[in-house]
Regions:
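Active-site nucleotide-donor binding segment shared across nucleotidyl transfer reactions
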Residues: 188-217
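Catalytic metal-binding acidic patch
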Residues: 210-230, 309
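A conserved beta-strand element that flanks and buttresses the S-adenosyl-L-methionine
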Residues: 465
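Class I (Rossmann-like) S-adenosyl-L-methionine-dependent methyltransferase catalytic domain
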Residues: 357-389, 394-457, 473-479, 484, ...
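Beta-strand-enriched, solvent-exposed domains that form extended recognition/catalytic surfaces
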Residues: 40-141
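Conserved catalytic core of two-metal-ion nucleotidyltransferases
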Residues: 240-295, 299-315, 320-321, 344-355
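Short catalytic micro-motifs in class I SAM-dependent methyltransferases
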Residues: 468-469
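Helical scaffold of the NTase/Pol beta-like nucleotidyltransferase catalytic core
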Residues: 110-199
């Protein structure tokens, strides 16, 4: 009998390991979703003018018919006879006025025996199903008496739906957030020459009440750029964010602002960038209620005021800016105010640069996170006994999986675009002849080849290892990288890929919008592997390997080997499941 080729030996080893893993994996189909509760009323029937339209885990939303010239009317949210929150609803012309109650924490204290009502005076508004009250289906997690005690002690439901002290009574918050503001003010002024000033809810509280809004949850500031071109404004905002990170601040980039926290991540302020365009109109990425432009001749510069026990900057013509931001009813307190509902205009060209947001956010992530234990995917791949001589860890992060492959005898090259990740990986102290880490833009054509060409030649059998890489880059970058794999992979080389799969719902919108995270359809990856001449060893979807918080993440794994030319080894038994969710180690 002829000696087996190296690829055939790999297949045989992988087949045995695959069988062992498959026997250990238990598969279960997801439980069917419970049927939706039918509505009690005829959907074709006319709806009352004043009503509750939506009840969710986060909010209760509805409309109130008030009349054009009516005074603001108070609506109160009750659990049984306990008044939990109230809003004063200002008239909205001929149309009914919208209202909203934030309810995230309230539901912890309510169960099927409780009755939720929204009342104008003593009269309840009809619920979405037409009844005068709503009862939750889930059991209460805490006694209602605890909610009553917390409200009696002065706590309120803030604009996120959380129970907390009003910000004007929370001295600890005021001291810590104004200390952070002072540090950020100094840094921003040194970097770009501008002072951050109060805006949005913080400015509204300062102007209307002379203190922070009780129901607010953050500290809003902005700086006014001297540039008029949106691209120059965006570039300045990006430079500022990176410079603040270099000074030790935690900085997250969002579409409309940056979130800045101190080194201990105890408090946060939001920093927006404002600018006047060539037409002398103020441009705001977050937007304003008023759609009438705020013009440059209305801007009167900054002044220092006392706010939350500290000296801060605020616009001199503050009332005019507040009226632009919040509209003509800004003097009426409205804890249920909703930007999604009330916003009149926003300047999309003023948004923080989309291409730069993932760069800043991944840098911030690796500056403040470190992981010691290898991932379950590293255990899975190493357990297949593929025995590569070289592992190229693509998007290696802080190199948490590298020690596992080094212990198995492989040399590892870790590549990542984020400087903080590469520096963290290098601090692992692995021997340089066994592991090295380089910064590399894997989306750039030829970048991977350049890194491989710099290694001692000829290269041993290589495993291209990509955990959470294909679901963190754009479609175009993914196509570029797969083309690189196809061009570089030699007979006997291997590829291992793990990505979030279609159907995964654990990604926060911030991860999708600002970090480049996404889910990946495994079908094109499967087709590409076949078209590129790889033989698949593992093709498996599962939700038992990783969690986002307490929720399992739906993943898909591929491990494949490129056969040696001229050899025809038996196709290995594959670990595969597309419709079932398997437990993993």
């Amino acid at each position: 009998m002829a000696d087996r080729s190296p690829a055939a030996s790999v297949y045989a080893s992988a087949r045995r390991a695959a069988g062992r893993v498959a026997r250990r994996l238990g598969f279960r189909r997801p439980a069917p979703a419970p049927p939706a509760r039918p509505a009690r009323t005829d959907p074709a029937a006319p709806r009352p003018a004043s009503r509750v339209d939506l009840i969710s885990t986060r909010e209760i939303v509805g409309v109130l018919e008030a009349g054009r010239d009516a005074a603001p009317q108070r609506l109160t949210l009750f659990v049984n006879e306990l008044a939990v929150d109230h809003v004063d609803v200002a008239p909205a012309g001929e149309a009914p006025a919208a209202f909203r109650f934030r309810t995230r924490d309230m539901w912890h204290y309510c169960g099927p025996k409780d009755r939720i009502t929204v009342r104008r005076g003593s009269d309840p508004l009809p619920m979405p199903d037409g009844s005068p009250h709503h009862s939750p289906t889930a059991k209460a997690k805490r006694p209602l008496s605890e909610l009553e005690e917390r409200l009696a002690a002065g706590e309120i439901i803030n604009s996120r739906g959380n129970l907390s002290l009003p910000k004007y009574l929370d001295a600890t918050w005021q001291q810590s957030v104004t200390r952070l503001y002072g540090e950020v003010d100094q840094a921003v002024h040194e970097i770009i020459g501008h002072h951050p000033f109060l805006v949005y809810g913080s400015l509204l509280g300062a102007v209307r009440e002379g203190r922070p809004l009780g129901h607010d949850h953050d500290f809003d500031t902005a700086y006014l750029s001297a540039h008029t071109d949106p691209e120059e404004v965006a570039a300045e905002a990006g430079r500022l964010a990176l410079a603040l990170q270099e000074r030790g601040f935690s900085v997250e980039a969002r579409a409309t602002c940056i979130h800045i926290a101190d080194a201990g991540l105890t408090e946060r302020i939001d920093l927006y960038h404002f600018f006047f365009n060539d037409s002398d109109e103020l441009r705001l990425a977050w937007g304003s209620v008023s759609d009438i432009p705020f013009r440059k001749d209305q801007w009167a510069g900054l002044e220092q005021i006392q706010f939350a026990g500290a000296t801060v900057f605020a616009p001199r013509n503050a009332e005019a800016l507040v009226a632009h931001l919040y509209g003509p009813n800004w003097r009426v307190p409205n804890p249920g105010f909703s930007w999604e509902r009330e916003r009149g205009t926003r300047a999309k060209e003023a948004a923080f640069p989309a291409a730069l947001r993932p760069v800043i956010n991944w840098q911030d992530h690796w500056l403040h996170h470190a992981f010691d234990a290898p991932t379950s995917f590293a255990h899975c791949v190493d357990g297949l006994q593929l025995a590569p001589g070289l592992v190229v860890d693509l998007g290696c992060g802080d190199g948490r999986d590298v020690p596992r492959f080094v212990r198995s005898g492989a040399r590892v090259l870790g590549l990542d675009y984020t400087p903080a990740a590469v520096e963290s990986a290098r601090r692992r102290g692995l021997a340089q002849d066994r592991a090295s880490f380089e910064r590399c833009d894997l989306a750039a054509p030829g970048a991977l080849r350049e890194q491989l060409d710099a290694l001692p030649q000829p290269l041993p059998r290589t495993l291209f290892y990509a955990r959470h890489l294909l679901d963190s880059i754009s479609d175009a970058a993914r196509a570029t990288l797969l083309a690189e794999f196809e061009a570089l992979a030699r007979p006997g080389d291997m590829i291992a890929v793990e990505s979030r799969a279609l159907g995964d719902d654990t990604l926060h919108y911030h991860e999708r919008l600002n970090c480049g995270r996404r889910v990946v359809d495994p079908s094109p990856i499967r087709d590409w592997l076949a078209g590129a001449g790889f033989e698949t060893v593992v093709d498996l979807g599962g939700s038992g390997w990783e969690k986002a918080g307490s929720k399992p993440v739906l993943l898909h794994r591929f491990v494949a080997v490129k056969p040696t030319a001229g050899s025809s080894p038996d196709r290995p038994s594959r670990i595969s499941s597309v419709t079932e969710h398997g437990g993993g180690r």
